[in-house]
Amino acid sequence: MTARMDKRFAELKAEGRPALVTYFMGGDPDYDTSLGIMKALPEAGSDIIELGMPFSDPMADGPAIQLAGQRALKGGQTLKKTLQLAADFRKTNDATPIVMMGYYNPIYIYGVEKFLDDALLAGIDGLIVVDLPPEMDDELCIPAIRKGINFIRLATPTTDEKRLPKVLKNTSGFVYYVSMNGITGSALPDPSLVSGAVERIKQHTKLPVCVGFGVKTAEHAKVIGGSADGVVVGTAIVNQVATSLTHDGKATADTVQAVATLVRGLSTGTRSARLVAAE
C-alpha cells in the first residue's frame, strides 16, 4: 500500500468502521465544478476518492457513468487534465487517498511510463483499470507497483476458487468486490451473499475488501458496510451531479452542494454499519 492508503485503512480499523469510497467522473460537467466536487467529498465524509478517467467506450459502465464521461469529454476533459485535477486537489488535501479508475486505452496512448510518473507527481495512490486482466500484469500492474502506486483488482461473483488467487496475486491497496454481474448502477445485492463473498475473499488475502455496485442510499451503505471493509458508491453520486445540471448539461450553483448532501448521508450510514452488525 501507499503510505496514505495504509494510514487510512489503519485509522478506520482503529475506529471500527468501514471506509466510504466515493467515485465521481473527472471533468463532469466541467473542470472547475469537478474540482469543487472532489474537494467537497472528504469534507462530507468520504474516506477514499475514486477519480474517474473519462473514456469514449466504457464497456463496464452503466448509462449514468457513460453519460458522465460524455459530458466530461464534451467539456474538454483529457487524461492530462484528470491528473491535474488530482494535483490541484493535493494543494489543500494531502491525507485523502486517490484512486484513478477507468480503462487502459487512454493510459496506453498517454504512455505508461509517463502516466505513472505524472500520477506519482499528482499524488495518486492507486489505479483500477477494469479491462486489464491479471494475464496482462506486465502492461501496467507491475510497473505501477514498482513505482509505489497500488493496483486494485476487481473480484466478482463469478470469480471462482481457481481464478481468485490469480486475481489477487499482484493486487495491492484493497480488493474491489463487484457485488453482482453486469454494469454499474444495478440493483442492491443480497447482503447475505455479499457477506459470504467477503469472507471467501479474505481466506485468500489480508487486504481490505471494499464492496461496490448497487449502493445508492445511507441504508444500503449501512447494510453492506456491516460485512465489508469499505463501501463504494459511484452511480448515485454521478446521478446526483446529473440531476443538478441545467437542461443543456451545465453546472448550477447547487451542483457541488447536492453531491455533498448525498455523501453526508452515505457517510452517516457507513459509520453506523458496525453498530448494526454487532446487534
Swiss-Prot record:
Identification of the protein by name:
Tryptophan synthase alpha chain
Active-site residues are: E50 (proton acceptor), D61 (proton acceptor)
Record field: catalytic activity: (1S,2R)-1-C-(indol-3-yl)glycerol 3-phosphate + L-serine = D-glyceraldehyde 3-phosphate + L-tryptophan + H2O
The family classification in the record reads:
Belongs to the TrpA family.
SUPFAM superfamilies cross-referenced by the UniProt entry: Ribulose-phoshate binding barrel (SSF51366)
Q: Which HAMAP family match?
A: Trp_synth_alpha
Identify the enzyme class.
lyase
UniProt cross-references to Pfam families, sorted A to Z? Trp_syntA
Coiled-coil positions are: none
EC? 4.2.1.20
List GO molecular-function terms, semicolon-separated.
Answer: tryptophan synthase activity
